[in-house]
């Protein structure tokens, strides 16, 4: 399983709007993509930062989403974020939520 972490700068006073957009617009878009498993978002209280972590079956699924779906997500989020988000991709090593064990265990 792979995850994409996207760090974003929120516009002033837009945390509630960001959360609404993720819940009502972004998650339904993500569910249409092959290999999508989960989305977890975090908003830093008192700061204008948010982190979105999407989980994918394979690295290829995550990369395909990055090529074909991510631009639509950015466009949808443009009302709540500013600047260019920073993206990092990781292989998931452990997760109690996703019932994943470390490789080699």
Report the location of each language-model feature:
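Short S/T/G/P-rich N-terminal loop/turn motif that feeds into the first structured element of a domain
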Residues: 1-51, 55-68, 78-105
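Short arginine-rich
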Residues: 73-77
């Amino acid at each position: 399983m792979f995850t994409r972490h996207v760090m974003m700068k929120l516009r002033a006073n837009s945390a509630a709007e960001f959360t609404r957009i993720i819940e009502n617009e972004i998650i339904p878009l993500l569910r249409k993509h092959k290999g999508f498993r989960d989305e977890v978002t975090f908003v830093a209280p008192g700061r204008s930062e948010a982190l979105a972590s999407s989980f994918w079956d394979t690295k290829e699924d995550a990369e395909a989403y990055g090529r074909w779906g991510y631009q639509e997500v950015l466009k949808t989020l443009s009302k709540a974020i500013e600047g260019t988000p920073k993206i990092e991709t990781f292989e998931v090593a452990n997760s109690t939520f996703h019932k994943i064990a470390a490789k080699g265990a």
